[in-house]
Regions:
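Conserved inter-motif catalytic segment of the P-loop NTP-binding fold
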Residues: 52-57, 61, 65-66, 185-264, ...
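Phosphate-binding/switch region of NTP-binding enzymes
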Residues: 161-163, 167, 171, 264-356
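Conserved catalytic network of the ASCE P-loop NTPase/AAA+ motor domain
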Residues: 154, 181-184, 208-212, 235-238, ...
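A generic local structural motif
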Residues: 146-150, 175-176, 229-232, 266-269, ...
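Short, flexible loop segments at the rims of nucleotide/cofactor-binding pockets, characterized by
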Residues: 138-140, 220-223, 257-259, 289-293
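Core recognition of P-loop NTPase motor domains used across DNA-transaction enzymes
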Residues: 2-47, 51-156, 223
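C-terminal regions of RecA-like/P-loop NTPase motor modules
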Residues: 1-61, 72-73, 237-238, 275, ...
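The Walker A/P-loop phosphate-binding site
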Residues: 38, 116-211
Length: 379
C-alpha cells in the first residue's frame, strides 16, 4: 500500500454527510487470506490498516495503523498512530477515535464514523471467511506433488518434516536439499533459529566447492515465527520463494512446544509465510525417551507436530568412525498422499575443504542401521 500524499484538510461544511471524509470515494482491500485489511480514502489523505488479527474471548483484536497526510497532523513518517485495538467493542472504537481526532488536529472529520466503518468492514470480511469451491474445479499440478532429493521425498506445497536426535546431520542435509532444489530453478530460503549465516555460508562453499553455489536466501530469526511472519512473507513474495526450511521448530515457538495451542499458532504462521506458492520443511528433534519403539518416533513436544506434517522422515545416525562418513538412515514415517517409501541411506563425507553427500546402501555401510529397516525392505 503506497504512502498517502500530504494535502489540506477537508474544505467548507465539514460536518455534513456530504463531507469528503464521509461521502468521498474509498477503497477497501483484503490482503492475502485476511492477514491484513486496508481502507484508503480517495478524496482525503487518510488510510486505515488492520494486521495481526486474533480472537480474544470472541472479540476481534488487531494492530491498527492509521496513516494521514493532513496539514498540521501529528504524524511520524505519515503514520498518525499504531495501536492494538478491540474492533468488536463500540466503546473501545469510540475511545480510539478520540485519539485520532487529537493527533490529527482535525475535529471537523468524523473519526468515530470512519473508524466504525473500517471496523465493521473488517468484521464483515472475517465473518464471510473464504468462499467454497468445487473439488472438481481445483486445478491439477503437472508433477506428483513431491520433490525427490537422493530418494527423500518432500511435499512441493505442503509441510514436510525431518526429526532426529542431535548430531544426526539434519542441518547440513537440509542445506543440501535447499541447494539441490535451487539448482533445479526453484527459489529457496532458510529460516535459521539455531545458528548464524556465516557457518552456513562456509558449509555451502564445502558442499559446492566448484564455486557454483546455488542461490539460497537466508534469514537469521531472533523472535518467534508468529511475530516475524509478516516481514518474512513480504520478503518471500518479493523474491518469489517456492520452498523454505525452518531450522528448527522449537526455538521458533512463542510458548512451550508441548502445548497444542503453540503448535497451532506456529502452523498458522508458517502457512501464512508459505501462502499458496511455497512448500516448507520443518526440522526438529525427537522425544528423548529410550522406551519408544521403532516406528513410533515423533517430534519433541505435542503430537500435533507430527499430525500436521504431510511427509515425515525420522533420521537415525550411526556415529562415524574416524575419517569415515556419517551414515544416516532416513525412515519414512508420515506419508499422506504418498505410498510408503523405502528407508534411504545417506552418507555425509566430511573431507578437507569439502562435504560430499551421497546415497548409500545401509546393508553394506551400516549393518546396525540396516537392522532397523522394515521387514519388507530387508527381504
Amino acid at each position: 500500500v503506497g504512502r498517502v500524499t500530504r494535502a489540506a484538510a477537508a474544505p467548507a461544511d465539514p460536518w455534513s454527510d456530504d463531507a469528503p471524509a464521509i461521502a468521498g470515494r474509498r477503497e477497501f482491500e483484503q490482503v492475502g487470506d485476511g492477514e491484513r485489511y486496508v481502507l484508503t480514502l480517495q478524496d482525503v489523505p487518510i488510510e486505515f490498516e488492520a494486521a495481526h488479527l486474533r480472537r480474544v474471548r470472541d472479540d476481534l483484536h488487531a494492530q491498527v495503523t492509521v496513516r494521514c497526510a493532513l496539514s498540521g497532523a501529528r504524524v511520524y513518517q505519515d503514520t498518525l498512530t499504531v495501536s492494538t485495538e478491540n474492533l468488536s467493542s463500540a466503546s473501545h472504537r469510540f475511545r480510539f477515535a478520540r485519539v485520532l481526532e487529537h493527533q490529527s488536529r482535525a475535529p471537523q472529520i468524523d473519526w468515530t464514523r470512519l473508524f466504525d466503518e473500517f471496523a465493521i468492514r473488517v468484521l464483515t470480511a472475517e465473518a464471510a471467511g473464504r468462499p467454497s469451491v468445487l473439488l472438481s474445479d481445483i486445478p491439477d499440478r503437472l508433477d506428483d506433488g513431491y520433490h525427490d532429493v537422493l530418494g527423500v521425498k518432500l511435499a512441493t506445497h505442503g509441510i514436510s518434516g525431518f526429526y532426529a536426535k542431535g548430531d544426526s546431520g539434519k542441518s547440513v542435509f537440509t542445506l543440501f536439499v535447499l541447494g539441490e532444489l535451487a539448482k533445479r530453478g526453484i527459489p529457496v530460503a532458510m529460516l535459521d533459529y539455531e545458528w548464524e549465516g556465516l557457518p552456513h555460508k562456509k558449509r555451502a562453499a564445502q558442499l559446492w566447492p566448484d564455486g557454483q553455489q546455488p542461490p539460497i536466501r537466508y534469514i537469521q530469526c531472533t523472535r518467534p515465527l508468529r511475530e516475524e511472519a509478516e516481514s518474512i512473507r513480504r520478503d518471500f513474495l518479493h523474491h518469489g520463494i517456492r520452498y523454505f526450511a525452518i531450522d528448527s521448530v522449537v526455538p521458533a515457538c512463542h510458548d512451550s512446544p508441548n502445548l497444542p495451542d503453540t503448535v497451532i499458532a506456529f502452523n498458522r504462521a508458517a502457512r501464512y509465510v508459505a501462502g499458496t506458492q511455497a512448500g516448507q520443511l520443518w526440522v526438529g528433534h525427537v522425544v528423548k525417551n529410550k522406551e519408544i519403539a521403532d516406528g513410533d518416533e515423533t517430534f519433541f513436544g505435542s503430537v500435533f507436530w507430527g499430525n500436521l506434517i504431510r511427509a515425515g522422515w525420522f533420521i537415525k545416525a550411526q556415529p562415524s568412525i574416524e575419517g569415515g562418513p556419517l551414515i544416516c538412515a532416513y525412515h519414512h514415517r508420515k506419508r499422506n498422499g504418498l505410498p510408503q517409501q523405502p528407508s534411504v541411506g545417506i552418507a555425509i563425507h566430511f573431507e578437507i575443504g569439502r562435504i560430499r553427500i551421497t546415497r548409500c546402501d545401509l546393508a553394506d555401510s551400516a549393518p546396525d542401521l540396516a537392522a532397523g529397516l522394515p521387514l519388507w525392505q530387508r527381504m
